[in-house]
């Protein structure tokens, strides 16, 4: 048996929102469970989900994931799910209150970053609390990224 300090968390990433870190300044991240049907889980295990255009919102004291795309599971005939239905996110009451306060008072957004399966095989969503970037901030980010690439190339050539 391995010592406790050396345990690694194995996460099988199913879908990732790659533009989120470019369009938003991420302040904090949360791990939320997803309420899914059986065919949605099987579709996720095939790895064909898309959360690039999705967002999360709070309604009635609950957090919902809206506009996420989980394709239909081909082997399920009439018991299939809707591809773009609203999905409830499972968070503790304290986390829900904290997120609602940040969204309502500070004008922040709830951005889904990625869907993955944790080490127990449960589907989880990494949810971020962030502020939208302005155009000049996006330009600054891309300039910084380009400079880091050039710097790494130069260091690689010399050493």
From Swiss-Prot:
Keywords, in A-Z order: Cytoplasm, RNA-binding
PROSITE patterns named among the record's database cross-references: SSRP
SUPFAM superfamilies: Small protein B (SmpB)
InterPro entries associated with the record: SmpB, SsrA-bd_prot, SsrA-bd_prot_CS
UniProt xrefs under Pfam families: SmpB (PF01668)
Listed GO biological process terms: trans-translation
Disulfide topology: none
Main location: cytoplasm
Any Gene Ontology CC annotation: cytosol
Coiled-coil region list: none
Comp. bias (Basic and acidic residues): 137-159
Region (Disordered) location: 133-159
Cell location: Cytoplasm
A GO MF label: RNA binding
Protein role: Required for rescue of stalled ribosomes mediated by trans-translation. Binds to transfer-messenger RNA (tmRNA), required for stable association of tmRNA with ribosomes. tmRNA and SmpB together mimic tRNA shape, replacing the anticodon stem-loop with SmpB. tmRNA is encoded by the ssrA gene; the 2 termini fold to resemble tRNA(Ala) and it encodes a 'tag peptide', a short internal open reading frame. During trans-translation Ala-aminoacylated tmRNA acts like a tRNA, entering the A-site of stalled ribosomes, displacing the stalled mRNA.
PANTHER family named among the record's database cross-references: SSRA-BINDING PROTEIN (PTHR30308:SF2), TMRNA-BINDING COMPONENT OF TRANS-TRANSLATION TAGGING COMPLEX (PTHR30308)
HAMAP family: SmpB
Family: Belongs to the SmpB family.
Name of the protein this chain belongs to: SsrA-binding protein
Lineage: Bacteria, Pseudomonadati, Pseudomonadota, Alphaproteobacteria, Hyphomicrobiales
């Amino acid at each position: 048996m391995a010592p406790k300090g050396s345990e690694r968390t194995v996460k099988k990433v199913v879908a990732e929102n790659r533009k989120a870190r470019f369009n938003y300044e991420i302040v904090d991240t949360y791990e939320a469970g997803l309420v899914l049907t059986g065919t949605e889980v099987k579709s996720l295990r095939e790895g064909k989900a898309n959360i690039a255009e999705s967002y999360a919102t709070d309604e009635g004291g609950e957090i919902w994931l809206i506009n996420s795309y989980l394709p239909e599971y081909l082997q399920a005939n009439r018991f299939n799910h809707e591809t773009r239905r609203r999905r409830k996110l499972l968070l503790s009451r304290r986390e829900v209150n904290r997120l609602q306060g940040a969204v309502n008072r500070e004008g922040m957004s709830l951005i889904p970053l990625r869907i993955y399966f944790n080490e127990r095989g449960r589907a989880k969503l990494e949810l971020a609390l962030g502020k939208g970037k302005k155009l000049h901030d996006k330009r600054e980010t891309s300039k910084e990224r380009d400079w880091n690439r050039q710097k790494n190339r130069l260091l690689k050539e010399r050493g």
